[in-house]
């Protein structure tokens, strides 16, 4: 952990490579009192960040992006052994992280207010930093989702305490070393950024509850997100939570395109993506064609060591996660689900699995977070819409059709934060608004939108008469 410019290197928690279970490092586990002290230090540095000019913040962010670019391959390898993500996907994550910092740099110089005239003068608005941002991040995109919180916070001029998942903290430690180097080069006090490692029920809980935190940004499970809403008090919160994202395929769709999109949308990071395809809702007339084509492609996926360049599917984040998914597959089959391919577990690897199910099956109503694709046949577009909306989740959805009127109808009527037309739900560019409704979250990320969430509007009234 990194607090006020000091590294603390206790070996409290083992960090293991989920693919082979080898120990790759250790991290300290902060106590609640240590967490409180770190938050106090970060609070004392709020004015330091606020007083940095937009140009200095821009230069900090661009320099971080530059340092990341120098070591892309090494950083990608660390993501892979940290998470079990195939190396070619880890390289993409590093590239996206660089872009996230560059976008944040751009927006750091685009902070704008308004002028509103009235008879005796004018109203001026300006955006000011909220103060101290607490960032809690997940394991599945341990570098880019970390960047999606800290980069906008820096752009807006906030101090930061960041708590990465204890399942995949090693890459955030490397990023923190880069941030330390950049801050030192700019002669900025290091207490503006603090990395707090440890157990979520201690470190994360204190960040959530502590009144010195002005803004909390959390990515993780619905269960923890719901708990946060009850504990956070009056601080601003952004929650990026789970999803059971429907991919709707109508009978006029380009089936080949739908298959390709579903392959990338379902099996990226072995299905451990919050916007992964959760279920396919497909009209009867084209269901057989789609199933036959996607099964053919799934059987060609390379399963194995995530460091191999041609690997497509590797381990889940832990053996416990894989065993949970195995039980879900078996329960689905017990409820009448038809296993089309896969269904096999080998240690922490779940082989790519396709099942045909009905709407009352367990897999139709939960976030699976694994390379498991449930397919549900529907009679028409209205049934597809109703089934898609019959969910507590509301993150992303996808619709495949060649009829613009149908596409716009679904765009208007799907109860989701994002609607993708002729694309799977698993699409995100790093400067678009991103987030869900219902139990899938509160607020929006995406650099400009995260900056808005991490700022306050100050209104200045000038009487000129």
From Swiss-Prot:
Alphabetized Gene3D superfamilies for the sequence: Aldehyde Dehydrogenase, Chain A, domain 1, Aldehyde Dehydrogenase, Chain A, domain 2
Keywords: NAD, Oxidoreductase
Family the UniProt entry places it in: Belongs to the aldehyde dehydrogenase family.
Primary role: Involved in F420 biosynthesis through the oxidation of lactaldehyde to lactate.
Catalytic activity entry: (S)-lactaldehyde + NAD(+) + H2O = (S)-lactate + NADH + 2 H(+)
Subunit details: Homotetramer.
UniProt-listed Enzyme Commission number(s): 1.2.1.22
Keyword GTP-binding: no
Official protein name in the record: Lactaldehyde dehydrogenase
SUPFAM superfamilies noted in UniProt: ALDH-like
Positions bound to NAD(+): 220-225
GO molecular function, one term: lactaldehyde dehydrogenase (NAD+) activity
Pathway participation: Cofactor biosynthesis; coenzyme F420 biosynthesis
Positions annotated as active site in the UniProt record: 240, 274
EC top class named in words: oxidoreductase
């Amino acid at each position: 952990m990194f607090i006020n410019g000091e590294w603390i290197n206790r070996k409290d928690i083992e960090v293991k490579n989920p693919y082979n279970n080898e120990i790759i490092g250790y991290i300290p586990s902060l106590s609640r009192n240590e967490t409180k002290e770190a938050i106090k230090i970060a609070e004392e540095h709020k004015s330091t960040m606020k007083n940095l000019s937009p140009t200095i913040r821009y230069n900090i962010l661009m320099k971080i992006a530059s340092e990341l670019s120098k070591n892309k391959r090494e950083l990608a390898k660390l993501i892979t052994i940290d998470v079990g993500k195939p190396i070619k996907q880890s390289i993409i994550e590093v590239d996206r992280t660089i872009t996230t910092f560059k976008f944040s740099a751009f927006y750091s110089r685009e902070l704008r207010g308004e002028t509103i005239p009235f008879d005796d003068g004018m109203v001026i608005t300006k955006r000011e930093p909220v103060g101290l941002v607490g960032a809690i991040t997940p394991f599945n995109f341990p570098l880019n989702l970390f960047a999606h919180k800290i980069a906008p916070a820096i752009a807006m001029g906030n101090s930061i305490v960041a708590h990465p998942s204890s399942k995949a903290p090693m890459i955030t430690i490397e990023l923190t070393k880069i941030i330390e180097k950049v801050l030192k080069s700019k002669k900025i006090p290091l207490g503006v950024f603090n990395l707090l490692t440890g157990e979520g029920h201690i470190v994360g809980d204190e960040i959530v509850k502590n009144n010195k935190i002005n803004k909390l940004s959390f990515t993780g499970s619905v269960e923890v997100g719901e708990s946060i809403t009850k504990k956070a008090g009056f601080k601003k919160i952004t929650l990026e939570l789970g999803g059971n994202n429907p991919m709707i395929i109508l009978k006029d769709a380009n089936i080949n395109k739908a298959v390709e999109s579903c392959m990338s949308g379902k099996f990226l990071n072995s299905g451990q993506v919050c916007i992964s395809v959760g279920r396919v809702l497909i009209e009867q007339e084209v269901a057989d064609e789609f199933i036959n084509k996607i099964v053919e492609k799934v059987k060609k996926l390379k399963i194995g060591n995530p460091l191999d360049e041609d690997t497509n599917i590797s381990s889940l984040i832990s053996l416990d996660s894989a065993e949970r998914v195995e039980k879900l597959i078996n329960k689905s089959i017990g409820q009448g689900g038809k296993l089309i391919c896969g269904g096999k577990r080998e240690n922490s690897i779940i082989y790519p699995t396709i099942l045909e199910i009905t709407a009352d099956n367990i897999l139709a109503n939960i976030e699976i977070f694994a390379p498991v694709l449930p397919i549900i046949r529907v009679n028409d577009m209205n049934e597809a819409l109703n089934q898609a909306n019959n969910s507590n989740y509301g993150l992303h959805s996808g619709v495949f059709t060649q009829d613009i009127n149908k596409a716009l109808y679904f765009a208007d009527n799907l109860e989701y934060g994002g609607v993708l037309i002729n694309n799977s739900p698993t699409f995100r560019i790093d400067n678009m608004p991103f987030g869900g409704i219902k139990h899938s979250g509160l607020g929006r990320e995406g650099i400009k939108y995260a900056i808005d969430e991490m700022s306050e509007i100050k209104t200045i009234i000038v009487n000129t008469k």
